[in-house]
Amino acid sequence: MAGGAFVSEGGGGGRSYEGGVTAFVIMTCIVAAMGGLLFGYDLGISGGVTSMEEFLTKFFPQVESQMKKAKHDTAYCKFDNQMLQLFTSSLYLAALVASFMASVITRKHGRKVSMFIGGLAFLIGALFNAFAVNVSMLIIGRLLLGVGVGFANQSTPVYLSEMAPAKIRGALNIGFQMAITIGILVANLINYGTSKMAQHGWRVSLGLAAVPAVVMVIGSFILPDTPNSMLERGKNEEAKQMLKKIRGADNVDHEFQDLIDAVEAAKKVENPWKNIMESKYRPALIFCSAIPFFQQITGINVIMFYAPVLFKTLGFGDDAALMSAVITGVVNMLSTFVSIYAVDRYGRRLLFLEGGIQMFICQLLVGSFIGARFGTSGTGTLTPATADWILAFICVYVAGFAWSWGPLGWLVPSEICPLEIRPAGQAINVSVNMFFTFLIGQFFLTMLCHMKFGLFYFFASMVAIMTVFIYFLLPETKGVPIEEMGRVWKQHWFWKKYIPEDAIIGGHDDNNTN
């Protein structure tokens, strides 16, 4: 490409800049994406630990007792215990609060500082859990883990979106989701192994959460900060040199000027939380709220949190329940590669819509199989064939999520906010995600006890609603530079009424279309 040239790209009217994909930016994004290991490891570890007999005997003897003595005459209510659910869900309540603190630190001190705080809090929380002697220590550890997750999830997707060139931003950003799936799979494998230990297997499972935390802490020292963040803090020359380095080009004037324009606009914003409520930011506000809500209401964390518990509820043995969780973890990780391949080739909308249809069908089928075997009484049994079918459809469901709502739930909110509201937008994204993750974690086992197999129909109906929402209201953002999202909203049939002309930056583009 000739020096200084830029061309229009499909998928929303944005343009690409000079420079290509460098080994430096790929390595940087890989290290940063390890922040997803924090989230993924915890998602995978808690369900396996809460199904371990030694753990239940020590901390939740009433649950272990009701399982052994079969006090409940329904399989649906076998694990229904609020304190047990609080062990899982408390992390996400802390993450919700931490995400708001992280947004301020991310803006004032850079993305790296937030990533460091996240890793350190997660490390301390892992040690609390590994050496816990009572439920209070467990909950304190989980709250510290939540602070780590809140900071990491607020800063890492923003960091990835700002470092990556627009044409591969989707693939590199999905590295965060890939790290989450790797963390889930590793946690499932560790749970399967530690369940064989005579003693303290649960301590090993919880303590090994320190490993991704150490990676995050070390990575935060190694990584450079983003040009966007440097400009926000007045380091213009350093920002330009970093932009040249990550783009592998000497002439980055057009992109650098757009970044400067965005930073100047951001400096005029004294309160991003107030400004994000303005009408011109309405699309970003809606999607930063709706996408994480819908992501959680798919029911995916029913599988991620409680896979071993769910499979034991349905009559799988201890080994079979843990191995089934490993299988879903493998499917989750491998399916994420589909998204990495497809997101910048076929766009975000196609993956959202296909994944939604796939999840809807699978939720209906799983609910129907469970209803046919257990009915409303919950006193039936699973045949091996039925168990295999349920596991198969859960795997297809997980695959649909893993190449659509899983990675895109983090990617799209991180790429649609202009710089002046980006920390606030990402904080909303993370906090809404964490709030509904908390609700699912805290009340799923109770909902299963009361709604029985109908719970899967409930999740299916939510998937149908969110798929229609995406079809009508989300424009394609493939190949659109972050600072040019105003053009995309301005061209959309519904959102254009909220976007004034002066909200579109980059006036030196001759290829603007209406």
From Swiss-Prot:
Induction: Induced under low-glucose conditions in pollen tubes. Down-regulated by glucose.
Cytoplasmic-facing ranges: 1-18, 474-514
Keywords (A to Z) from UniProt: Disulfide bond, Membrane, Sugar transport, Symport, Transmembrane, Transmembrane helix, Transport
Domain of life the protein comes from: Eukaryota
SS bonds (residue pairs): C77-C449
Chain ranges passing through the membrane: 19-39, 86-106, 113-133, 135-155, 170-190, 204-224, 285-305, 320-340, 350-370, 389-409, 428-448, 453-473
Result, substituting C77A: Increases sensitivity to alkaline pH and can only function fully at acidic pH (pH < 5)
Deletion consequences: No visible phenotype under normal growth conditions.
Protein name stated in the entry: Sugar transport protein 10
